[in-house]
Regions:
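Residue-identity detector for threonine
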Residues: 9-13, 19, 36, 44, ...
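Long, charged/polar, low-complexity intrinsically disordered N-terminal extensions
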Residues: 1-90
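Long, acidic, intrinsically disordered low-complexity segments
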Residues: 1-21, 221-227, 232-233, 315-343
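Catalytic core segments in nucleotide and nucleic-acid processing enzymes
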Residues: 267-372
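Interfaces and regulatory segments of ATP-dependent nucleotide/adenylate/phosphodiester-chemistry enzymes
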Residues: 24, 31, 36-43, 66-69, ...
Length: 372
């Protein structure tokens, strides 16, 4: 006689209720002790073989967001290490309350949004530094100085200065791999930066990448999700926009990985938010030129889009084209350059339909052009 599988017991999920409880708990602690506990938590990597992900940094930064975007109770008390760990564990366990998190029909998509949430803190240091260096090359050497002009008009600092100062802080963050949090005394970075860039440029740079201690609550409040949607669990932390906390004595870095990721994402984010499709169109052309310059170094036969169009005209063919064709003896590679950056919905959704719709005019379009 064949055994029948036991029916699954459906447990009522209560994400919203548990978030409210966590926020209520957080509001009973003073801000300074919470940030101190978070800084201390990242001074030791719990499992070096797993890296900083073993400290659950995505949970810590969500706790920071909720802590500073909710009003304090009238009487607050200092937070200790046990209190902090309890909050982090409760936030980690929230994933059990997220609708469809363990959906058997969407296993890969469900795992995907969880992995995206964590990979920010797992990127190799070399990759983070290379990303910053490549960006400097793209924005400062292409399109006739357009990116530098529009960036300087808005923020009062050249891209050259931004990337050089960012490289300084990125390298500083690589000195001690055994700690994720760091403190840089004001006298140290001023001695290194003022002689080369001057006081005004350093100030404008810090205005761009740091938030003052007494402005932390105002900054975090701008990211508050009043509806407490489950998607908030997977979003990038607000500190991606301001990776430094500025105090009179120096700069506090809560996460070196987040710092390096922020420094390399800030410029494209600011340009995209300010100039929208105009920026995207220009950057797409930059990427096409950059890829072309790399392909030209290959010994292979490279056919550009311009040459492809010419061949089409000669043969009276009407069809879409890719940007490059690379011909080898063993086969042909079709390359189409697309300046694609996944939006928030793509990052946190586990709906195949929603992801497909969002990628229809970018990634999927490029694949179809290559097939045609």
């Amino acid at each position: 006689m064949a055994l029948k599988a036991f029916p699954r017991v459906k447990v009522r999920k209560d994400y919203n209720g548990k978030v409210v409880a966590i926020k209520k708990k957080l509001s009973g602690y003073d801000d300074a002790s919470f940030i101190t506990m978070m800084y201390d938590h990242f001074q030791t990597i719990l499992k070096p073989e797993l890296g900083i992900s073993s400290n659950f940094p995505w949970c810590c930064f969500l706790a920071l967001k909720w802590k500073l975007s909710e009003p304090l109770k009238r009487n607050v008390s200092p937070m200790n290490k046990r209190d902090f760990i309890d909050i982090v564990n409760r936030i980690y366990n929230l994933q059990n309350e997220v609708s469809g998190f363990f959906d058997d029909k969407k296993v890969l998509l469900s795992l995907r949004r969880m992995i995206i949430n964590q990979q920010l803190y797992q990127a190799p240091m070399k990759l983070e530094l290379n990303t910053l260096a490549r960006q400097y090359y793209w924005y400062c050497n292409y399109d006739g100085g357009y990116f530098d002009k529009v960036f300087q008009e808005t923020h009062g600092i050249t891209l050259e200065s931004y990337y050089k100062i960012s490289a300084y802080f990125a390298m500083m963050s690589c000195i001690d791999n055994g700690k994720e949090s760091e403190y840089i005394p004001v006298r140290l970075y001023l001695i290194h930066l003022i002689p080369m860039f001057g006081t005004d440029i350093v100030k404008k740079y810090l205005d761009l990448v740091s938030v003052k201690w007494n402005e932390l609550r105002g900054f975090m409040s701008g990211f508050k999700d009043i509806k407490q949607r489950e998607s908030e669990y997977y979003l990038d932390p607000p500190m991606m926009m301001k990776p430094f906390i500025l105090i009179d004595e120096g700069l506090i870095i809560l996460s070196k990985h987040l710092l390096r990721a922020s420094l390399s994402s800030l410029v494209p984010t600011l340009l995209k938010d300010k100039h929208g499709s105009s920026y995207k169109d220009r950057f797409a052309k930059v990427m096409e030129s950059y890829i072309g310059s790399i392909l030209n170094e290959l010994p292979s036969k490279i056919i550009s889009e311009k040459e492809i169009i010419s061949i089409y005209k000669q043969n009276e063919v009407q069809s879409k084209t890719v940007d490059f064709i690379v011909r080898e003896d063993v086969g042909t590679v079709y390359i189409d350059s697309k300046a694609i950056e996944p939006d928030k919905i793509i990052k946190h959704s586990n709906s195949a339909k929603s992801i497909k719709e969002r990628l229809a005019n970018s990634f999927i379009k490029g694949v179809i052009q290559g097939m045609d």
